[in-house]
Amino acid sequence: MERKERLRAGIAAMGPDISETAQDRLLAYVDLLKKWNKTYNLTALRDEEKMIVHHLLDSLTLLPYIEGAQTMLDVGSGGGQPGIPAAVCRPDVQITLLDANTKKTAFLRQAAIELGLDNVRVVSGRVEAVSDVRADVVTSRAFAELADFVSWTAHLLKDGGYWAAMKGVYPQGEIGRLPQDVCVEKVQRLDVPGLDAERHIVILSKR
């Protein structure tokens, strides 16, 4: 299956309304990942089909959970997942991509420029040291244990905001280790077309 058809079929199976222009931009992002990966080691994946599944479709499972947001922070953004696909599909949301690795943030800045993502800001640094970002939604994909994630980012969450942590298998142990002042709003299993591995999203808020 041609890559454009594979992406379109995956999106159709998942349900979000994503324009042809946005889909083309998502594939252009994959091209940038492949180009920069040779030097910067942004992803262990080399196969384009796997990139579409793991980096695009997997990231797009976040979209229903940022519907009401105006601002989003992607912590430990790495090669830009889920932040860049989210930014492509939600140009109305101001998205900050944060990573401590300067090579990765250099890529993220270039990707935002080349993809024309005016709604993206890139911040280089450790999350604990960042103080000039506030977001309605703070998200991450496989960044850290939940207790650490909320502890390190609580100062970056707006009042009334929430965390959206993208995880693999159901993180029962991690949920049990969350601090008492954090409320588990929802744990939802995610279906990613073409991906056999388990995926869950954990929605958390301050009590």
Swiss-Prot record:
Binding site for S-adenosyl-L-methionine: G76, Q81, V127, E128, R141
Gene Ontology, cellular component aspect: cytosol
Any Pfam family: GidB
Enzyme class, spelled out: transferase
Catalytic activity: guanosine(527) in 16S rRNA + S-adenosyl-L-methionine = N(7)-methylguanosine(527) in 16S rRNA + S-adenosyl-L-homocysteine
Gene3D superfamilies named among the record's database cross-references: Vaccinia Virus protein VP39 (3.40.50.150)
MF GO annotations: rRNA (guanine-N7-)-methyltransferase activity
Annotated keywords: Cytoplasm, Methyltransferase, rRNA processing, S-adenosyl-L-methionine, Transferase
SUPFAM superfamilies: S-adenosyl-L-methionine-dependent methyltransferases
Compartment(s) where it occurs, according to its Swiss-Prot or TrEMBL record: Cytoplasm
Matches recorded under CDD domains: AdoMet_MTases (cd02440)
Family, as annotated: Belongs to the methyltransferase superfamily. RNA methyltransferase RsmG family.
UniProt protein name: Ribosomal RNA small subunit methyltransferase G
Species this chain originates from: Neisseria gonorrhoeae (strain ATCC 700825 / FA 1090)
Record gene name: rsmG
